[in-house]
């Protein structure tokens, strides 16, 4: 058995991931991967909080167990934590009245329905057993700007001297029947005229929206496919998620916001 994991890198990743989770009050578990950029080999992979495989039924997140054991009404903070860990849709019906009941009920056919406590307990156990790195969909955020930039350069449609103007906001579908939406840069920043390197340095959302407009949906989507974002990674670990939030070329052509959101 040959593993690509480096125990020293793994230990460092787990230490700093735990520190970051505490600093930023992470609700939905943290994940981190370190890869060899030349081969794709995984040097470290961590999902926190962890659990003890010898005692998998115990919920190791003290905050979650405290919420689960409450007999009075849940606070807004409690509900926020549950939704952050399990997803809003997953818990909405269970905690609709704000109280976790330990009583079983029956459906219209007389079948027993597990108590809300038991349902949530099972969901929390399953959540801590999962390897978050591969079983959950991850929204890449601003790191995707590198994909947009690469598509522009490789296609020859743009070069590093390509400039676009950032005035701080861009409103689409204004006054139309379609969904009106205003895009901003982080913290309301206005970056003015920038080339590609400056836009990457500033993580300018509006520059990359205009870059995607220049590329057009068909070319942009071709590169999204070429980078492998429309298919599983093929990692030799079980239960890799097959969900995707990538809009195809037709969807990006039909709805401007689909193209713009994908760009940055």
Predicted segments with their positions:
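Non-catalytic, structured segments within soluble enzyme domains
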Residues: 1, 31-34, 261-264
